[in-house]
Amino acid sequence: MKYIKWFGCFAMVTLATCLTTTAQQPQEGAQKGKYLIILQAGKEGHEGMARAVHALLYTEELLKHGHQVVLVFDGAGTEWIHEWSNPATQDKLAPRYRELQKQKVTEIVCDFCAGAFQVKKDLQDRKVSLTSEFEGHPSIAKWADLGY
C-alpha cells in the first residue's frame, strides 16, 4: 500500500507548519518523495525569520535523506533570496542557504513577487533566474503534475 505524503509550507496551510499525512516510521529502502517547499514569509519580524529557518532546515533534512526538493521563493519570500544572493550579506541564515546551493537544490523565484517587493532588478543583476509561468507567478500545478 502506498501512502501519500504531503509536505505543505504553503501560506494557506501555515508556513511555519510542515506536515506529513502518515504517522508511520520510515522504512529502510522506502521510496523517496518529492517535496515543494514554498517560502512566502518576509524578513520582517521574528515570525518571518522562523519560517525562513524552517524552510531551509526542512529542505536540508529532506535532501540528506535522498528526497527531491524544490524550494520556491514567493511573495515576501523573495526578500530572503534577495538577501542570500548578495555576496556581501551578513545574514546568519546565508551559510545554511549556500550549503543548499552546493547540494544543487532546485530553486524557483517568483518574477511577479520579486517586482512587487522591489528586489527584481538586484536579482536580475545577480543572475538569479525568475519564473513567471502562471499569471506572472511560478506554476504550482506543474509541480503537482510532476508528483510534488
Predicted regions and their residues:
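Bacterial N-terminal signal peptides
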Residues: 8-18
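A short aromatic-anchored loop/beta-hairpin motif
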Residues: 99, 117-138
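Short internal beta-strands
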Residues: 59, 69-75, 107-111
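Short, glycine-rich nucleotide/cofactor-binding loops
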Residues: 30, 36-53, 81-85
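Bacterial N-terminal signal peptides that target proteins for export
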Residues: 1-8
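Boundary at the C-terminal end of the N-terminal hydrophobic targeting segment
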Residues: 21-23
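A glycine-rich helix N-cap at a beta->alpha junction
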Residues: 87-119
